[in-house]
C-alpha cells in the first residue's frame, strides 16, 4: 500500500479541470439530478449516490443554491432524463481510455466521443474492450497536509478502505464500490470534505509516457473528450515519467 504514485496523471487532469470551473459545475449538477432520479429520493440519508454526489459537489465549491436547485429540479417532469453510457477505446501508443458519460442524446454523445478519438489518432472500441485493464472502485483523495501517511493509512483501513497511495500531492484511498459510501462518510467525519471523491476506473498497471510529444498528443485527446458537457470523467492507464511530468506541468 505504498510506492510510486500511479495517480500522478489524476493530478494533471485536476489542474486542467480547475481551469474549466463552469463546465465542472455542469457535470456535477447533472450527476446530482441523475442521483435523485435513479435513487428515487432527494434525501441524502436515503440515497447513497446522492450523498456521494453532494460530497463531490461541495469539494468543488458548487454553490449551495445551485445544489438545492439541482435537487429540486429532479422532481420536475420537464427536467431531462440522462442515460449513463460508458465508452472504451485506445489512444495512440496503446493507452487504454474509458469515458463515462451522462447524456440526453446518445447519438450526439457517441458522435462527439468518436470524433475526438479519430481526430487525435485513437480508436473507439466496443464496451468491454479495455475495462479488464482497470479496477472499478471508489476513489477518495485528500491533500497530503491533511494527515501523515501513517495516520491516513490507519484511518483508511479502519474505515474499510482497500488501498492507499501517498505522494507529494495527495493521499489517494481506494475502496470497494460497496464500501465507498461508508468509507467516504467516515473519512469526511474525520478529515472534512475530500479534495475529490468518485466511483471510477483505476488502472491495474500503467504505461509510462517518457516522450513529451506523445504526452502532449495524448492530453489533447483527453482534453477534447472532457470538453463535452456529456462526459463526466475520463480514465486512462498512462503515467508520465518524472521529466515529462515536470515539462507538462510547466506548460499549464
Swiss-Prot record:
HAMAP family registered for this protein in UniProt: Transcrip_reg_TACO1
Entry similarity comment: Belongs to the TACO1 family.
Any one annotated GO CC term: cytoplasm
Protein keywords: Cytoplasm, DNA-binding, Transcription, Transcription regulation
UniProt xrefs under Gene3D superfamilies: 1.10.10.200, 3.30.70.980
Location of the protein in the cell: Cytoplasm
GO biological process: regulation of DNA-templated transcription
Superkingdom, natural source: Bacteria
Protein name: Probable transcriptional regulatory protein A1C_04175
Transcription keyword on record: yes
GO molecular function, one term: DNA binding
Keyword Ligase found: no
Amino acid at each position: 500500500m505504498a510506492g510510486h504514485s500511479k495517480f500522478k496523471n489524476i493530478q494533471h487532469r485536476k489542474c486542467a479541470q480547475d481551469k474549466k470551473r463552469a463546465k465542472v459545475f455542469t457535470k456535477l449538477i447533472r450527476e446530482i439530478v441523475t442521483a435523485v432520479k435513479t435513487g428515487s429520493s432527494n434525501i441524502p440519508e436515503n440515497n447513497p449516490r446522492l450523498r456521494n454526489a453532494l460530497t463531490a459537489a461541495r469539494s468543488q465549491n458548487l454553490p449551495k443554491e445551485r445544489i438545492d436547485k439541482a435537487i429540486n429540479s429532479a422532481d420536475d417532469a420537464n427536467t431531462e432524463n440522462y442515460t449513463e453510457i460508458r465508452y472504451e477505446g485506445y489512444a495512440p501508443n496503446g493507452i487504454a481510455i474509458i469515458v463515462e458519460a451522462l447524456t440526453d442524446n446518445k447519438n450526439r454523445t457517441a458522435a462527439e466521443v468518436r470524433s475526438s478519438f479519430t481526430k487525435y489518432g485513437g480508436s473507439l472500441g466496443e464496451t468491454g474492450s479495455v475495462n479488464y485493464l482497470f479496477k472499478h472502485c471508489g476513489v477518495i483523495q485528500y491533500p497530503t497536509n491533511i494527515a501523515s501517511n501513517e495516520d491516513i493509512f490507519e484511518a483508511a483501513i479502519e474505515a474499510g478502505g482497500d488501498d492507499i497511495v501517498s505522494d507529494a500531492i495527495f493521499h489517494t484511498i481506494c475502496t470497494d464500490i460497496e464500501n465507498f459510501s461508508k468509507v467516504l462518510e467516515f473519512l469526511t467525519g474525520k478529515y472534512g470534505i475530500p479534495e475529490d471523491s468518485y466511483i471510477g476506473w483505476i488502472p491495474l498497471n500503467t504505461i509510462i509516457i517518457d516522450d513529451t510529444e506523445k504526452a502532449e498528443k495524448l492530453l489533447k485527446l483527453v482534453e477534447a473528450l472532457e470538453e463535452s458537457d456529456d462526459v463526466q470523467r475520463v480514465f486512462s492507464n498512462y503515467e508520465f515519467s518524472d521529466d515529462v511530468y515536470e515539462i507538462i506541468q510547466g506548460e499549464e
